[in-house]
Amino acid sequence: MTMPFYVPAEQQMKDKADYARKGIARGRSVVVLQYDDGILFVADNPSRALHKISEIYDRIAFAAVGKYNEFETLRLAGVRYADINGYQYDRRDVTARGLANAYAQTLGTIFTETAKPYEVELVVAEAGLDADSDQIYRLTFDGSVRDEHGYVAMGGQVDAVEQALKERFTEGMSLSAALRAGVQSLEAQESGRRLEAKALEVAVLDRNREHRLFRRLPAPRIEELLAEGA
């Protein structure tokens, strides 16, 4: 008689975590950083159709790395969550913190109760009235949440990108300076690499706008900003 196969719970969790980390590391990186007038999102993403950066609600945006169909499912769920809560209560009641908590519950449940975890990492950000009131939350595949300030890097060779961001980031940067710092940090993954504007997906939450703060930056505008002070 054969003995039933048993895997300790600790080993199951470790295997799932390793699986998710490997999937996320295979993707291209995204960086999120604060600048003087809001929050900047920069993705190494040449695709014009498959977005890694998206608007969720008036002051809230979403960035993700990993498996596209999985984080797109989460993005759509986030939009529905925001729309329903804004309609039933008040638009001011829709916050990045509330959305991050909802995502954390979903990701945590998937990680613990299903055989395959989501291969995703997310940032949910909300532009406040000033830099001190900005909210940036980083969510990992197991539902863990971290409240970040200044900058975040996800996906790809994340250690190299984070180190480059640490060296370049300063509080109160202009948009052009923040964009250069973000792009140079993405380029740090590979010696001699240079990212052109058409290979980048860039968006901002601009606190100087009214109502909807999210806007995408087209390639000509990206080139113009990168040239400033270069």
Curated annotation (Swiss-Prot):
GO CC field: cytoplasm; proteasome core complex, alpha-subunit complex
Control of this protein's activity: The formation of the proteasomal ATPase ARC-20S proteasome complex, likely via the docking of the C-termini of ARC into the intersubunit pockets in the alpha-rings, may trigger opening of the gate for substrate entry. Interconversion between the open-gate and close-gate conformations leads to a dynamic regulation of the 20S proteasome proteolysis activity.
CDD domains hit by this protein: proteasome_protease_HslV
One annotated GO molecular function: threonine-type endopeptidase activity
Pathway: Protein degradation; proteasomal Pup-dependent pathway
Quaternary structure, from the entry: The 20S proteasome core is composed of 14 alpha and 14 beta subunits that assemble into four stacked heptameric rings, resulting in a barrel-shaped structure. The two inner rings, each composed of seven catalytic beta subunits, are sandwiched by two outer rings, each composed of seven alpha subunits. The catalytic chamber with the active sites is on the inside of the barrel. Has a gated structure, the ends of the cylinder being occluded by the N-termini of the alpha-subunits. Is capped by the proteasome-associated ATPase, ARC.
Function summary: Component of the proteasome core, a large protease complex with broad specificity involved in protein degradation.
Principal localisation: cytoplasm
Keywords of this entry: Cytoplasm, Proteasome
Gene encoding the protein: prcA
Gene Ontology biological-process entries: modification-dependent protein catabolic process; proteasomal protein catabolic process
PROSITE patterns, A to Z: PROTEASOME_ALPHA_2 (PS51475)
Protein name: Proteasome subunit alpha
The UniProt record lists the keyword Cytoplasm: yes
Protein family according to the UniProt entry: Belongs to the peptidase T1A family.
Lineage: Bacteria, Bacillati, Actinomycetota, Actinomycetes, Streptosporangiales
Compartments, record wording: Cytoplasm
PANTHER family: PROTEASOME SUBUNIT ALPHA/BETA
